[in-house]
């Protein structure tokens, strides 16, 4: 019975801490690069401005304000 009470108190504490500090890991879509209409790519391919306050899921990629010619229509038409 004592173990059950301790577990209940621990669960209550965790709920209280989460409520005070908010969501410990915000959802990806809330601050993602592509959700705002930007593009995730490796740094050499970025032809626009690097948008620092949004992030990409892929490691080593940056959030870029405009697509590179490599990923854009020009490359597709030339192929």
Swiss-Prot record:
Signal peptide start-end: 1-22
Changes after translation: Contains 3 disulfide bonds.
Species of provenance: Panulirus argus
Free-text tissue specificity from the UniProt record: Expressed in hemocytes (at protein level).
Propeptide: 23-26, 75-79
Molecular function per GO: serine-type endopeptidase inhibitor activity
Any one of the GO BP annotations: immune system process
Subunit structure: Monomer.
Function as written in the Swiss-Prot or TrEMBL entry: Involved in the melanization cascade in response to lipopolysaccharide (LPS). In vitro, reversibly and competitively inhibits trypsin (Ki=8.6 nM) but not serine proteases chymotrypsin, elastase, subtilisin, thrombin and plasmin, cysteine peptidase papain or metallopeptidase carboxypeptidase A.
Stated name of the protein: Panulirin
Keywords: Disulfide bond, Immunity, Protease inhibitor, Serine protease inhibitor, Signal
Disulfide-bond pairs as recorded: 33-63, 40-56, 46-64
């Amino acid at each position: 019975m004592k173990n059950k009470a301790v577990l209940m108190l621990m669960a209550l504490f965790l709920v209280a801490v989460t409520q005070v500090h908010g969501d410990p890991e915000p959802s990806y879509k809330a601050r993602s690069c592509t959700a705002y209409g930007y593009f995730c790519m490796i740094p050499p391919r970025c032809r626009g401005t690097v948008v620092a306050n949004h992030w990409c899921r892929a490691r080593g990629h940056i959030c870029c304000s405009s697509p590179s010619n490599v990923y854009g229509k020009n490359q597709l038409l030339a192929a």
